[in-house]
Amino acid sequence: MGLKMSCLKGFQMCVSSSSSSHDEAPVLNDKHLDVPDIIITPPTPTGMMLPRDLGSTVWLDETGSCPDDGEIDPEA
């Protein structure tokens, strides 16, 4: 799933023509950057759950401790 160079050049022209403030990073023309495969996401605000986290959620009781504190997790 690669992008054609013509698409990238059009995107760079749009970005460079719209950047008028000095706070924005300059557009790097004809440079290939080594970007790692790891994507770091900010923490989710309290009270919001992502669908992938619903199955592995451990709910705390009113004392703030896990209901299974005394047991060893067999999957660990």
UniProtKB/Swiss-Prot annotation:
Pfam families (UniProt xref): DUF4597
Region (Required for interaction with PPP3CA) location: 36-41
InterPro entries: DUF4597 (IPR027864)
UniProt modified residues of type Phosphothreonine: T44, T46
Effect ascribed to mutating T44A: Abolished phosphorylation and interaction with PPP3CA
Domain of life: Eukaryota
UniProt KW keywords: Phosphoprotein
Quaternary assembly: Interacts (via PxIxIT motif, when phosphorylated on Thr-44) with PPP3CA.
Note: May act as a prognostic marker of median survival time in pancreatic cancer patients.
Protein name: Uncharacterized protein C16orf74
The species this protein was found in: Homo sapiens (Human)
Chain's gene name: C16orf74
